[in-house]
Amino acid sequence: MATVQAFPMRALPGEQIAATLNQVSKNYGAVQALKNFSLEVRAGELTAVLGPNGAGKTTAIKLLLGLARPTSGRVSVFGGDPTALETHLRVGAMLQVGRVPESLRVHEHIDLFSSYYSQPLAIKQTLAIAGIESLRDRKFGELSGGQKQRVLFALAICGNPDLLFLDEPTVGLDVEARHLLWDEIRQLLTLGKTVVLTTHYLEEADALADRVVVINKGSMIAEGTPQEIKARTAGKKIRCTTRLSVGVLRALAGVVDVQDDRGTMVIHTSRPEDVLRELLNRDLAISGIEVTGAGLEDAFLALTQEKAN
């Protein structure tokens, strides 16, 4: 794996737009995956696209990659058609459905994928950025799930793309490997690359994103910096040890969601004072109470529940 290193802060991104979805709707039969959806991906930024399963994230990515056509509206990448060859030469993608032959060695895969591009990175540089120098001569089929993820990341960047799509890139990685990949993504941003990231790890979006877009039921429900998204909810997170069940806690007024973290209840709430009062009334033996400010996860839960209601 690549050595962890500090990356310099990059200059503030300009207003140049790398890709757009303009009033796009996409229907699959009677199902409307996107409804009058608009999005601007700004050059030099990392845009994180968040949403529950089935929200429309994958459909939006497919449209930007030219893998699907909109039912209505306009899709543009670098001012042109996303299906055009000249567009594909400037785009890299790491998708969840990515599969490659298991019998080829890692360097053979990189060499093959690099041949599709006019100005690819040197294989040595690709291996270094992805932190897989030690896997160079290994067959893909011999690798662990996490190692395969890193090779797929290498294949996404080997063409030296200007626009990079990363769909759940850290799935299967342990915490250390995940943070190393974050550093590698930051390095790409310092080189002026544009990244569109989808992830279920909300701390990942919080750590990496310049802008966050939240989608639910085919519509954009929030857009802004991570700080702006978090500021949209006045919620708090209450941690405590209580005899009350998850079901009882979820039924309390003002509770957005509840998780059982190995016996400690984590309560996301928009009305912390009311919830605390109710907890103390219902469980005199409650202990370990801790109240913290809302994070991106809390804001995400509040926004998506608001849309559902």
Language-model segments: residues:
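ABC transporter nucleotide-binding domain
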Residues: 182-270
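Solvent-exposed beta-strand sheet faces enriched in polar/charged residues
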Residues: 22, 78, 241, 290-292
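Conserved protein kinase catalytic domain
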Residues: 88-92, 127, 230, 276, ...
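ABC-family P-loop ATPase nucleotide-binding domain
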Residues: 1-25, 306-309
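C-terminal coupling/interaction segments
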Residues: 2-7, 270-309
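Short alpha-helical
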Residues: 82, 101, 118-121, 203, ...
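ABC transporter nucleotide-binding domains
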Residues: 16-19, 26-197, 202-203, 207-216
